[in-house]
Regions:
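Active-site residues of response regulator receiver
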Residues: 8, 54, 82
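Short amphipathic alpha-helix used as the core "switch/output" element in two-component signaling
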Residues: 41, 63-74
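Active-site beta3 strand of CheY-like receiver
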Residues: 46-52
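Short, flexible helix-to-coil linker/hinge segments that flank and couple to helix-turn-helix
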Residues: 88-95, 100-135
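Acidic catalytic/metal-coordinating carboxylates
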Residues: 35-38, 60-64
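A short, hydrophobic beta-strand element within the central beta-sheet of small alpha/beta folds
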Residues: 76-85
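The feature encodes the CheY-like receiver
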Residues: 13, 53, 58
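Short hydrophobic/Thr-rich beta-strand motif most characteristic of the beta2 strand and flanking loop
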Residues: 26-34, 42
Length: 135
């Protein structure tokens, strides 16, 4: 099973991702965090395979949390999740050490696909971001 941590500052988003991803028997949601500080601590104690990381959280952003997690390990796969499609956000997260980027316009099916690909060691960009990068 792939151990997943969900990190988002919006309760409804956390609950929706949890509900959706819990239906896939390959995934196990091991923690749900509401800010960057919580996800950093959860990564230290729970050793997830994948973190789904909202980039806009307070007081510690998803970008900063990604950077801190990367200072401790390269073993955890991190997929950024955001409403932002601007390349500076994508670049900042990827430079911090993320393995992928998915916008909140993406489907649950696409998120599961992203998880599977980053677990294979590949980078993943949702179609919306891939189209922007290629244009």
């Amino acid at each position: 099973m792939i151990k997943v941590i969900i990190a988002d500052d919006h309760k409804l988003v956390r609950e929706a991702w949890n509900l959706l991803l819990s239906r896939d028997k390959r995934l196990s949601i091991i923690a749900i965090c509401e800010n960057g500080s919580q996800v950093i601590e959860a990564c230290k104690t729970l050793s997830p395979d994948v973190v789904l990381m909202d980039i806009n959280m307070e007081p510690v952003s998803g970008i900063e949390a990604t950077r801190v997690i990367r200072e401790h390990t390269d073993d955890i796969r991190i997929i950024g999740i955001s409403v932002h499609t601007d390349l500076p956000y994508v670049n900042a997260l990827m430079h911090a050490g993320a393995n992928g980027y998915v916008t909140k316009n993406s489907s649950g099916e696409e998120m599961i696909h992203a998880i599977m690909l980053v677990m294979e060691g590949k980078q993943y960009f949702c179609k919306e971001i891939a189209d922007i990068i290629s244009s």
